[in-house]
Amino acid sequence: MAEAQNDPLLPGYSFNAHLVAGLTPIEANGYLDFFIDRPLGMKGYILNLTIRGQGVVKNQGREFVCRPGDILLFPPGEIHHYGRHPEAREWYHQWVYFRPRAYWHEWLNWPSIFANTGFFRPDEAHQPHFSDLFGQIINAGQGEGRYSELLAINLLEQLLLRRMEAINESLHPPMDNRVREACQYISDHLADSNFDIASVAQHVCLSPSRLSHLFRQQLGISVLSWREDQRISQAKLLLSTTRMPIATVGRNVGFDDQLYFSRVFKKCTGASPSEFRAGCEEKVNDVAVKLS
């Protein structure tokens, strides 16, 4: 009977575990310098991060060159045919074999380079963090402690979530600090009936045209439209939570003329200030009756 292979870097290892992780340091003509060839793939997933040199992944006549920072995801049943690129002196890659938790499904839906082989490349700022997480997973996965495997799985979950977070940031980049400061300035000056864009632009050291462009680019609406939304929101809050006279509410949000305030409020909400307040009071009374 053949002796079981205990080295996960060599052919024949069973990978009969929830998580196995390691580093494969392939040097030209070294003992690990051969192509992995699993035409039927594996039962679990494998994540592969290139950290040095170059590797090449082959799949039915197509090839992909792995460079430092590239992360590949091989799902169950996907062809595994990869090794050191023939023109590279080395290919060092960290890897994690795992069987996922059921709720990870969405996090494992990666864009593919071909067939079902997933690909993700963090931007330069995030690459050290992903490499560090891989290292922590490997250390925990190779540990002998009672909770080592659970810790490794927890770190892997963090890595998958970090990828989701990085993708979300790329789709929704953080707000420009100048736009954020402009929003704060506008919110602090809602009662200013002499408001103009120039004063906001001066506060954040931009020209009015540049501020208007950035505002629309980041928030999708104009400065004046955003301010009006804030004024109406604040007016609704004051009408629903205080007994402040309607004229005073209007002045608190920059309307000196009560009739004009009422017109604008009704246009935005479909109800006059007095109707809106009455509706809020009715809802409060209904809740009080139900609780009594």
From Swiss-Prot:
Residues that, per the record, bind alpha-L-arabinopyanose: P8, T24, R38, Y82, H93
Record's keyword annotation contains Transcription: yes
Keyword Magnesium included in the entry's annotation: no
Induction record: Negatively autoregulated. Autoregulation is either greatly reduced or nonexistent immediately after the addition of L-arabinose. Transcription is stimulated by CRP in the presence of cAMP.
InterPro entries documented for this protein: AraC-bd (IPR003313), Homeodomain-like_sf (IPR009057), HTH-like (IPR037923), HTH_AraC (IPR018060), HTH_AraC-typ_CS (IPR018062), Tscrpt_reg_AraC-type_HTH (IPR020449)
Any one Gene Ontology cellular component term annotated for this protein: protein-DNA complex
Keywords attached to this entry: Activator, Arabinose catabolism, Carbohydrate metabolism, Cytoplasm, DNA-binding, Repressor, Transcription, Transcription regulation
Outcome of mutating S209A: Defective in DNA binding
Domain of life assignment: Bacteria
Result of altering D257A: Does not bind DNA
Domain HTH araC/xylS-type: 180-279
Activity modulation: Arabinose converts the repressor form of AraC to the activator form to regulate the araBAD promoter. In the absence of arabinose, AraC binds to the araO2 and araI1 half-sites in the promoter region of the araBAD operon, leading to the formation of a DNA loop that blocks access of RNA polymerase to the promoter. In the presence of arabinose and the cyclic AMP receptor protein (CRP), it binds to the adjacent half-sites araI1 and araI2, leading to the binding of RNA polymerase to the promoter region and transcription of the araBAD operon.
Function: Transcription factor that regulates the expression of several genes involved in the transport and metabolism of L-arabinose. Functions both as a positive and a negative regulator. In the presence of arabinose, activates the expression of the araBAD, araE, araFGH and araJ promoters. In the absence of arabinose, negatively regulates the araBAD operon. Represses its own transcription. Acts by binding directly to DNA.
Comment block on domains: Contains an N-terminal domain that binds arabinose and mediates dimerization, an inter-domain linker region, and a C-terminal domain that binds DNA. Arabinose is bound within a beta barrel and is completely buried by the N-terminal arm of the protein. The DNA-binding domain contains seven helices arranged in two semi-independent subdomains, each containing one helix-turn-helix DNA binding motif, joined by a 19 residue central helix.
Assembly: Homodimer.
UniProt-listed NCBIfam families: PRK10572.1 (NF007860)
PANTHER family documented for this protein: ARABINOSE OPERON REGULATORY PROTEIN, ARAC-FAMILY TRANSCRIPTIONAL REGULATOR
Descriptive protein name: Arabinose operon regulatory protein
